[in-house]
Design a protein with these regions (language model features):
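Histidine-centered catalytic micro-motifs
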Residues: 50-61
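Divalent metal-coordination and catalytic microenvironments
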Residues: 9, 23, 44, 55, ...
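Acidic active-site catalytic centers that drive phospho-/nucleotidyl reactions
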Residues: 41, 53-55, 112
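Active-site loop-helix segments enriched in His/Asp/Glu that coordinate
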Residues: 85-125
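Histidine-rich, glycine-flanked metal-binding segment
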Residues: 1-4, 10-48
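Hydrophobic "anchor" residues on beta-strands that sit immediately upstream
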Residues: 3, 51, 108
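Active-site gating loops and adjacent loop-to-helix segments of metal-dependent hydrolytic enzymes
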Residues: 62-93
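N-terminal hydrophobic targeting/anchoring segments and the immediately downstream early-domain regions
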Residues: 45-46, 59-60, 66, 111
Length: 125
């Protein structure tokens, strides 16, 4: 089974070693002894258990690129025009994409507020 040992990484204000075997974190502590398949020097790195995004409009992910780098008033005008054409399916797929992006970056929980909340919830499941 694949194993990874991260040595001397910053975790919750202290330097520790983290042993991962397969897809499980097996041990977190000082001076973990294990012959791992891969050893990573974590002395210039930090780890975080998870992130929580407390303000999202996940369904808007598919609007990315509309009026970027514009003043807020112009951006809002463009987004509001686009939102007049929203469908439940659009929100579903936008939320699905947002969830995949959040998982990829370590976000495990989020508070969402957007149109068609039942479709957003369905995408999360």
């Amino acid at each position: 089974m694949n194993s990874i040992l991260i040595k001397n990484v910053l975790f919750e204000s202290q330097r520790v070693d983290i042993l991962i075997v397969g897809n499980r974190i097996e041990k977190i502590g000082k001076d973990v002894e294990f012959i791992a398949d891969k050893v990573i020097d974590g002395s210039e790195k930090g780890v975080f258990p998870t992130f929580v995004n407390m303000h999202t409009h996940a369904g808007m992910t598919l609007f990315r690129g509309i009026s970027e780098d514009m003043p807020l008033s112009i951006w809002l005008d463009e987004i509001w025009k686009a939102e007049t054409k929203l469908t439940p399916e659009f929100v579903y797929w936008g939320t699905k994409l947002a969830c995949l992006e959040m998982i990829k970056t370590g976000t495990t929980a989020f508070a969402d507020m957007y149109w068609y909340p039942e479709k957003g919830a369905q995408a999360v499941e």
